[in-house]
């Protein structure tokens, strides 16, 4: 019987064990009716026939065991890897598991870590319990939904407030020591009537040179009427004369600094009577920035100089601007403080008691059954193939005759014709002239007695 091996392309004639020679065929593919072909699958083909191995979600290794445990459609574990991440309690198909963020928990740890508890007694809720809700996060038992001060049970429709996670009824919340916010709220009536209070005085002191200190923020509208201090244009204004300041140009920096110190030491004030103040305020209410024509009329009506009128309007605009900024800041601060006080006392405003509802926590998942699966049926899969040299046999007795294929037809002259459609893929470029035939008669011998 002739046997053809893949990857070697040799053909041998096997004789009985009693003979001492192994005849090598004269031609490579002889038409002999007893010729058999041995076809072994390649390692790549063996790998393709194997089913994909499952990966354990606990140890991240392939599951080579015959049986494995499955939790959820995409979580598979070794039997020894499925356990609670908190208490390391083993889980099997006789129990239920809970999954949160890809981690498995037992029932006790899952309820302890993730279930909603009463905001007052910190107890658990049963599925049949009715609960009272105070906002999105505070949940109470029916008996726990009461004022902590008077222990009054709150009914549907009553108002309540929450402070420091404690529940208060409306009457007890009013008695709490709330921060006083009245000081931060400005008195708009006083701010708006500051100008009217000056009418009660028979005279008013006006600082003529006050605007010089704020010259960087506002600009003068009447540059033609501006004149240095001590000029003869300031009619009706008591202005002391300083000889060393008025004589010369006074251009040096040291002289300017000395002049400013002297001016701060002796400030000139103009006294305005009630009639003059009334005329200026009435004009300011109509037009806060009078032009040159209007200023000339004011000079005639009040008897004041143009410079005094210009400085009075500039000071008035600056004071009103500062007052408006202060009012806006006080209003924003009072609103912010009021919101913070409301949050510290009752969260977001006074709350209304709603009817009791069943306790349903949609954020928690239900229990998941653990299923026991077999990774393959019957015998286990073969071990991974070993890549290396072609298979060689030490003796003819090591062949498994059960894997030998069909006999060769008489007119077959090549392995591809002998194996049919499979032969073209197994021996795609086979040629008898280029066969790696190197065996000789003394390379392989028949079994012999131990004496040899």
Swiss-Prot record:
PANTHER family: INSULIN GENE ENHANCER PROTEIN, TAILUP, ISOFORM A. It is found in: Nucleus. Signal peptide: none annotated. GO terms for cellular component: nucleus. Residues 184-268 are annotated as: Disordered. Residues 54-116, 117-179 form the LIM zinc-binding domain. One of its GO terms (molecular function) is DNA binding. The keyword Metal-binding applies. Keywords: DNA-binding, Homeobox, LIM domain, Metal-binding, Nucleus, Repeat, Transcription, Transcription regulation, Zinc. Residues 347-376 are annotated as: LIM interaction domain (LID). The keyword Transmembrane helix does not apply. Interacts (via LID domain) with ceh-14 (via LIM zinc-binding domains 1 and 2). Its main location: nucleus. Pfam families: Homeodomain (PF00046), LIM (PF00412). Residues 265-324 bind DNA. Probable DNA-binding transcriptional activator. This is LIM/homeobox protein lim-7. The lineage of its organism: Eukaryota, Metazoa, Ecdysozoa, Nematoda, Chromadorea. It comes from Caenorhabditis elegans. Expressed in gonadal sheath cells, URA motoneurons, and 10 additional cells near the isthmus and terminal bulb of the pharynx. Expressed in the ALA and BDU cells. Residues 192-205, 217-227 have a biased composition (Low complexity).
């Amino acid at each position: 019987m002739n046997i053809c091996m893949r990857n070697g392309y040799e053909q041998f004639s096997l004789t009985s064990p009693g003979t001492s020679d192994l005849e090598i065929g004269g031609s490579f593919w002889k038409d002999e009716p007893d010729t058999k072909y041995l076809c072994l699958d390649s390692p790549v083909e063996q790998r393709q026939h194997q089913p994909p191995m499952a990966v354990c979600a606990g140890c991240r290794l392939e599951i080579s065991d015959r049986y494995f445990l499955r939790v959820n459609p995409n979580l598979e574990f070794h039997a020894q890897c499925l356990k609670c991440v908190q208490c390391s309690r083993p889980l099997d198909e006789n129990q239920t598991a809970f999954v949160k963020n890809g981690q498995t928990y037992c029932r006790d740890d899952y309820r302890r870590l993730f279930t909603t508890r009463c905001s007052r007694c910190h107890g658990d809720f049963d599925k049949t319990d009715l609960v009272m809700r105070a906002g999105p996060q505070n949940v109470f038992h029916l008996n726990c939904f009461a004022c902590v001060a008077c222990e009054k049970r709150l009914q549907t429709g009553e108002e309540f407030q929450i402070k420091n996670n404690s529940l208060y009824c409306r009457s007890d919340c009013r008695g709490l020591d709330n921060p006083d916010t009245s000081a931060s709220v400005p008195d708009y009536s006083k701010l708006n009537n500051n100008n009217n209070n000056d009418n009660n005085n028979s005279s008013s002191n006006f600082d003529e040179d006050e605007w010089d200190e704020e010259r960087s923020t506002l600009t003068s509208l009447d540059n033609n009427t501006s004149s240095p201090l001590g000029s003869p244009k300031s009619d009706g204004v008591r202005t002391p004369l300083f000889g060393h300041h008025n004589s010369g140009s006074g251009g040096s920096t040291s002289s300017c600094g000395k002049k400013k110190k002297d001016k701060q030491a002796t400030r000139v004030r103009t006294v305005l009577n009630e009639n003059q103040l009334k005329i200026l305020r009435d004009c300011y209410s109509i037009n806060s920035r009078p032009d040159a024509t209007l200023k000339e009329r004011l000079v005639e009506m009040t008897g004041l100089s143009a410079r005094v009128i210009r400085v009075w309007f500039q000071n008035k605009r600056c004071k009103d601007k500062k007052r408006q900024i202060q009012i806006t800041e006080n209003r924003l601060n009072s609103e912010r403080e009021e919101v913070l006080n409301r949050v510290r006392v009752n969260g977001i405003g006074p709350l209304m008691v709603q009817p009791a509802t069943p306790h349903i926590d949609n954020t928690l998942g239900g229990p998941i059954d653990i299923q026991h699966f077999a990774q393959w049926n019957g015998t286990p899969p073969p071990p991974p193939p070993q890549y290396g040299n072609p298979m060689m046999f030490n003796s003819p007795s090591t062949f498994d005759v059960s894997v030998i294929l069909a006999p060769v037809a008489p007119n077959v002259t090549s392995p591809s014709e002998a194996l049919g459609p499979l032969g073209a893929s197994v021996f795609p470029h086979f040629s008898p002239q280029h066969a790696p035939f190197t065996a000789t008669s003394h390379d392989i011998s028949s079994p012999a007695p131990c004496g040899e």
